[in-house]
Structures are given as structure tokens and as C-alpha cells.
């Protein structure tokens, strides 16, 4: 019988990993109605990079790549995309998993290797992606602070007509 500490312990890191992932790029979802999913994520402040009836790419204001990828299909979580900083890592992964390096979606650019985790979820590893153009960041709201002098002395009006922008995944 294992103790709670043993059951909840994080597995040790591999001493010789196949590659070093440098970041989370995107989550991948499928939804029967891509347009409805796009509107849902826009309501939370994401921005559309590209969208049609079969595929939508959305991002936050600071994201350099699309951070939410929605494909048409039964409602499901499909997997995620991760990035590596070295093209050799893609080829090493492809060889180790008996797959190929392929061109990534044109809106993202670069190359990718698509793997499956033990539960069958897609894990896409990308390299050489093209950064998206920066989006204007929201201006910060000036607030009166107890020790702040001089006082701002003006009314702050918040814009509730649209959701706040999502900064980053």
C-alpha cells in the first residue's frame, strides 16, 4: 500500500531526454461548430489569427504563435503543441518515434513532429515558427494609491463593451 506522498510524487526527470522543450505553444481542440467556438474564445478576449468552417487559430496579445487551435470534429481535447529551440531535436524525435518531420500549418510556419501520448492525445513539437505581429497591449489603468502624490484626481472609466484582452496562454 503506497502512501499519499508516494502516489502524488512527481516522477523523476529523465537523465537523457530526447529533446528540451522550451515552451507551451497551443492547446488543440475539436468542436462541431468552429464558428461558435471562435465566438466563445473571442468573448474571453482572444484574437482570431485565421478562421474558416474547418479550422480556427486564436491568440492572446503577447502570444507569438496561435495559442488555441480549434478543428472541426466531435467535441474533444485533441492535445497540445510544444516548441523546441533546435531543429536537430525535431529530427531526433522523429527518428526515435519512427515518424517524419513535416511542414507546419502555414499560419504558424516552420516544421513539426506529431506524436501521440500514451492516452492517444496529439503532441505536436514545432520549430522554426514565424512570430506573429505584435498586437497593441491594453493601457494600464492609473489608480490613486495611499502614498501616491499627486493624486490622479480624475474619474476612471472602464470599457465594458468588450472583454479584456487575453495576454498569453
How would you name each of these model-derived features?
Residues 70-83, 136-146:
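A signal for specific C-terminal beta-sheet/loop modules enriched in small/flexible residues
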Residues 1-17, 23-33, 72-168, ...:
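Vicinal oxygen chelate
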Residues 39, 68, 90-92, 135:
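Short acidic, gly/pro-rich beta-turn/loop elements at beta-sheet edges
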Residues 46-78, 122-129:
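Conserved short beta-strand elements that form part of the metal-binding/catalytic scaffold
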Amino acid at each position: 500500500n503506497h502512501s499519499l506522498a508516494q502516489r502524488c510524487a512527481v516522477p523523476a526527470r529523465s537523465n537523457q531526454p530526447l529533446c528540451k522543450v522550451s515552451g507551451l505553444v497551443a492547446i488543440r481542440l475539436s468542436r462541431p461548430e468552429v464558428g461558435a467556438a471562435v465566438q466563445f474564445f473571442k468573448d474571453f478576449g482572444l484574437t482570431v489569427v485565421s478562421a474558416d468552417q474547418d479550422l480556427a487559430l486564436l491568440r492572446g496579445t503577447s502570444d507569438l504563435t496561435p495559442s488555441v487551435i480549434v478543428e472541426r470534429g466531435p467535441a474533444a481535447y485533441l492535445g497540445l503543441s510544444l516548441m523546441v529551440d533546435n531543429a536537430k531535436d525535431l529530427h531526433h524525435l522523429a527518428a526515435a518515434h519512427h515518424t517524419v518531420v513535416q511542414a507546419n500549418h502555414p499560419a504558424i510556419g516552420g516544421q513539426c513532429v506529431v506524436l501521440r501520448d500514451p492516452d492517444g492525445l496529439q503532441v505536436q513539437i514545432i520549430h522554426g515558427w514565424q512570430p506573429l505581429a505584435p498586437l497593441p497591449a491594453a493601457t494600464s489603468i492609473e489608480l490613486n494609491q495611499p502614498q501616491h502624490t499627486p493624486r490622479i484626481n480624475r474619474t476612471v472609466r472602464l470599457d465594458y463593451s468588450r472583454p479584456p484582452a487575453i495576454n498569453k496562454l
